[in-house]
Amino acid sequence: MKISNSERRLRQPIVVVLGHVDHGKTTLLDKIRGTTVVKKEPGEMTQEVGASFVPSYIIEKLAEPLKKVIPIKLQIPGLLFIDTPGHEYFSNLRRRGGSVADIAILVVDITEGLQKQSIESIQILRERKVPFLIAANKIDKIPGWKSNNDIPFLASIEKQRNDVKVYLDNLVYNLVSQLANLGFSSERYDRIKDFTKTVAIVPVSAKTGEGVADLLALLAGLTQRYLETRLKFAEGPAKGVILEVKEDPGLGHTIDVIIYDGVLKKNDTIILGGINGIIITKVRGIFVPRPLQDMKLSKYDLTPIDEVYAAAGVKISAPNLEEALAGSPIYVVEDESKVERYKQQIEEEIKEVRLYSDIDGIILKADSLGTLEALVSALQREGIPIRLADIGPISKRDVIEASIVAQRSKEYGIIAAFRVKLLQGIDTSGIKILYNEIIYQLIEDIKKHINDVREAEKRRTFDTLILPGKIKILPGYVFRRSDPVVVGIEVIGGIIRPKYPLIKEDGRRVGEVLQIQDNKKSLERATKGMEVAISIKGNIMIGRHVNEGDVLYTDVPKEDLEILVNKYPSSITDDMREVIKEIIRIKRKEDPLYGLGLQI
């Protein structure tokens, strides 16, 4: 039924569903829509964005048994769900200073609690100022739970044994504790007195449908009550955001758009952001799915319409959309005099996200404005510097920029690519490119790379140092008396390696460790407590320069000691620390500044 303009007071809220992989967000949406979306998706994971409208009469019908607990008379037309594979597509629901989404459902496996992607989603929701509630999914997996298909949670919980209720409460309070650590007050929804200060937790089972009625009733009631000003219907020209750019058979290049304000009509002039500049074009066709039908499953059921009111998920066909930018704002231009204002507004928004500086930082490329913004934000939280952040495939310029950085800061001389490829024919010149299609995973890959490079550099530097060591020539274990001397020794403290120079207790150099052996097997090192045979090369003879029972030290250069103490303090063992103090006493006889100011 079409609602007349005079009857329109509130638009439908835009609801985004987020959650960790396999926590059940697609299954939950499937249950809400009453379709079999999951079964039509390869690998049971959402492959592309969709938008589904759930009309008010469906919500009221489902929530009928809850009217005593959640009394609602709906004035909103329904709920518009954005089906998102993780927060990658939610990122494109961007709006200056916030998000197009009015409210979010964070789906959490109640048996596992908050996972990495859940926490990352919460951080983005907080940044975009989007209120959310928790769908604590998979209650059917609770030991002893008796499933009751498609009934409200409050009805189902009454049918459970006391020990099962206690078990559920413990799982809920585990979530409450995790959310408290992130700075949020939360509680099971039926125990909340003030929803403005407390995140609601709704126990559900996407598999059996238990709790879905509670979830929908709460969503509709909360948005209608607390977001009324935001939901007020506006009659003016449409404002929206591009979710995805596609090439559709028979339609050419199209854009999937969420209209969050105003009215969009066929033949309207629209202005939007493109990869290489502003695009101004005319709407050739508007297509919408039927209620309870997912946009991405309705390629053959798309209905062409002449106009659409906010909020709605629509497909727009128009000329010159090949370079349209996902995540860009889109505006209807009724008056040519406003073109320049909209153009400037869009350009400023894009400029805020695209970055370039001459610092040593990583090169970041993404497929859309929204994902680029989310990645930049996540990297800034991690303290990872960014030299260049841009949209589109990896170009020769990106490789050159990464090469410049690699010469000075090897750990940052990389290109991180989110859903973009390398342009053909470009030589990467040995520059590492990290690809990933999950935001939090790409961030983890970047962190791992930086850490691996630093650790390798640390090992290289550390391995070139002459480390403190103290040995004793064992009496009765002289195998060769002259150059090279071969003797049995015990390592009293620290470490010795081949090529380490040795000094006596009076500071005189006696030679260099040539080889270390244990039972005729060559060793790279010997540490405290080990008894091994070593050969010493140099002008040395047992009985003349050194004697059985003598104590020798490694001759640690001043610079090596400073690097060891300042850069690698965690590598200094207790026995090595004592050896350092003894070496400092010996070396200061010749150099009073040796080891001065070091915190041993």
From Swiss-Prot:
Entry's InterPro entries?
A: EFTu-like_2, EFTU-type, P-loop_NTPase, Small_GTP-bd, T_Tr_GTP-bd_dom, TF_aIF-2_arc, TIF_IF2, TIF_IF2_dom3
- Looking at the record, which segments are called G5? 205-207
Tell me the GO molecular function terms. GTP binding; GTPase activity; translation initiation factor activity
Going by the UniProt record, its keywords in alphabetical order are: GTP-binding, Initiation factor, Nucleotide-binding, Protein biosynthesis
Residues annotated as region G4?
A: 137-140
Q: May I have one GO cellular component term?
A: cytoplasm
Q: Which residues bind GTP?
A: 19-26, 83-87, 137-140
The residue ranges of the tr-type G domain are: 10-227
Question: Region entry G2: which residue ranges?
Answer: 44-48
Region feature (G1): 19-26
SUPFAM superfamilies linked: Initiation factor IF2/eIF5b, domain 3, P-loop containing nucleoside triphosphate hydrolases, Translation proteins
| Residues covered by region (G3) | 83-86
GO BP terms: translational initiation
In the record, which residues are listed under signal peptide? none
**Role noted for this protein:** Function in general translation initiation by promoting the binding of the formylmethionine-tRNA to ribosomes. Seems to function along with eIF-2.
Family statement drawn from the similarity comment of this UniProt entry: Belongs to the TRAFAC class translation factor GTPase superfamily. Classic translation factor GTPase family. IF-2 subfamily.
Q: This protein is called what?
A: Probable translation initiation factor IF-2
User: Which species is this record about?
Assistant: Saccharolobus solfataricus (strain ATCC 35092 / DSM 1617 / JCM 11322 / P2)
The gene behind this protein is: infB
